[in-house]
C-alpha cells in the first residue's frame, strides 16, 4: 500500500513538473497565445485599419492567461507597439482594450521618436549609435579612444549626450547622471544585424545584440547632470568586463594587494576588490581603484574591510605605480566612502 501510494505521489509530482515546464511552451493545453493573438489582430484592424500588423506574441508567464502581442506600424518602420491582452477575460492591461491599444500606440510612437532623437544626436556628433538599453536610457556607440584622444572623445560624446538626454528618466525623476557605453568599432561591425523586417526600436534594443556588444571589455562613461543639463566635460569612464574577465581581473588585483600587504602588514587580510575601476585621466591603459582590507585576518572573525589600498593597474589588473593606504573608509552606518566613488 505504501509503495503504491508513494508511486502515485511520485507520478503526480512528475506530472506537475512536466506540466509546469510545458507551460513555457504550450501551457499543458491551458496557456496559449493563439486566441490572444487573434483577438489582438481583430482589435488592431478595427481601430487602426491597415496600420498595425502582428509580429509576435508571448505568454505572460507565470500568469495563467494573457499574452504580450507586438505589432509593427505601417507608417513608422522604427516603431513597435506592445499590448498585453487577455482574450478570455476580454481585457487589455486589465482594462478596456480600445483605451489600452490607443495608449500602447502612443507609447510605441513616442519611443520610436526618442530613438530617432538619440540616433540623430550621436550621428550629428560623428558617432554611430549601435544599440541602446530597452528603456533607451543608456546608448551604445562605436569609438576607439587612445591615450592621445580619450579626453577629446569623451568630451565629444558628452556633447552628443547633452543634445539628446532628457532632463528626467523613464520614471519621471530628475536625472543625476547619464551613462554611455563605448564599444570598439571592430566589435560593433560584428554585431548581429537582426531581422530587416523588425522595427528599428526592437533591433536596437534586442537582448542578443546587447549581449554581443557586452561580450568583451568595453568602456562605460558617466556624465553628470546639473540643473537638468548634461555637463559634457564631466565624463568619467570605467572599464566594464564580462563575468569571466572580471573574475580574472579581480584575482590579479587581489593577489597583488595581498602580496604587498604581507610585506607591510603581515596580519592584514583582503576583503574585496572594488566594483568600478575608472580610467586614469588622459589614459585608456591605466585604471584607478581600491581593494578593501582589515588589520587582522583569521581567528573566525569576518574581514569586512575597514580600510582600503588605492592603486593604479593596467587593463589586466597588474599594478602600475605605488600602493596607497586609506584608513577608516566606512561611515557610522557601515557604508564604504571612498574618494571618487
Question: Residues of each region from the PLM?
Answer:
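A short, surface-exposed beta-strand/turn
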Residues: 78-104, 296-334
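Secretory targeting and sorting signals
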Residues: 2-29
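Long, acidic/polar, low-complexity amphipathic helices and coiled-coil-like
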Residues: 83-188
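Short, non-transmembrane alpha-helical segments in secretory-pathway proteins
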Residues: 28-56, 106-122, 240-273
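Exposed beta-strand-loop-beta-strand "reactive/processing" segments of non-cytosolic proteins
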Residues: 51-85, 277-302
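Short, non-transmembrane amphipathic alpha-helical segments
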Residues: 39-44, 48, 150-173, 260, ...
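Intrinsically disordered, low-complexity segments enriched in Gly and acidic/Ser/Thr residues
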Residues: 214-308
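Glycine-rich, aromatic-bearing surface loops/beta-hairpins
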Residues: 159-226, 230, 237
Amino acid at each position: 500500500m505504501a509503495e503504491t501510494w508513494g508511486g502515485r505521489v511520485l507520478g503526480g509530482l512528475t506530472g506537475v513538473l512536466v506540466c509546469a515546464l510545458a507551460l513555457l511552451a504550450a501551457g499543458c493545453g491551458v496557456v496559449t497565445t493563439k486566441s490572444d493573438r487573434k483577438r489582438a489582430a481583430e482589435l488592431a484592424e478595427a481601430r487602426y485599419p491597415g496600420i498595425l500588423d502582428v509580429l509576435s506574441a508571448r505568454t505572460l508567464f507565470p500568469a495563467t492567461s494573457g499574452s504580450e502581442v507586438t505589432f509593427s506600424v505601417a507608417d513608422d518602420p522604427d516603431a513597435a507597439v506592445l499590448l498585453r491582452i487577455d482574450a478570455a477575460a476580454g481585457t487589455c492591461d486589465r482594462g478596456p482594450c480600445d483605451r489600452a491599444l490607443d495608449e500602447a500606440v502612443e507609447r510605441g510612437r513616442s519611443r520610436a521618436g526618442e530613438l530617432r532623437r538619440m540616433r540623430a544626436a550621436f550621428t550629428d556628433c560623428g558617432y554611430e549609435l549601435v544599440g541602446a538599453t530597452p528603456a533607451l536610457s543608456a546608448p551604445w556607440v562605436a569609438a576607439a579612444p587612445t591615450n592621445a584622444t580619450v579626453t577629446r572623445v569623451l568630451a565629444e560624446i558628452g556633447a552628443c549626450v547633452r543634445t539628446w538626454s532628457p532632463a528626467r528618466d523613464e520614471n519621471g525623476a530628475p536625472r543625476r547622471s547619464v551613462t554611455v557605453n563605448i564599444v570598439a568599432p571592430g566589435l560593433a561591425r560584428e554585431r548581429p544585424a537582426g531581422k530587416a523586417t523588425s522595427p528599428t526600436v526592437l533591433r536596437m534594443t534586442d537582448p542578443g545584440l546587447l549581449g554581443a556588444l557586452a561580450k568583451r571589455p568595453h568602456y562605460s562613461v558617466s556624465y553628470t547632470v546639473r540643473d537638468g543639463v548634461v555637463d559634457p566635460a564631466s565624463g568619467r569612464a570605467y572599464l566594464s568586463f564580462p563575468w569571466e574577465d572580471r573574475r580574472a581581473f579581480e584575482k590579479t588585483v587581489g593577489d597583488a594587494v595581498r602580496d604587498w600587504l604581507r610585506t607591510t602588514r603581515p596580519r592584514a587580510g583582503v576583503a574585496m576588490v572594488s566594483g568600478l575601476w575608472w580610467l586614469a585621466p588622459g589614459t585608456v591603459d591605466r585604471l584607478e581603484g581600491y581593494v578593501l582590507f582589515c588589520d587582522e585576518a583569521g581567528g573566525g572573525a569576518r574581514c569586512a574591510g575597514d580600510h582600503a589600498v588605492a592603486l593604479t593597474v593596467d587593463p589586466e589588473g597588474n599594478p602600475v605605480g605605488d600602493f596607497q593606504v586609506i584608513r577608516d573608509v566606512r561611515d557610522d552606518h557601515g557604508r564604504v566612502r571612498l574618494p571618487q566613488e
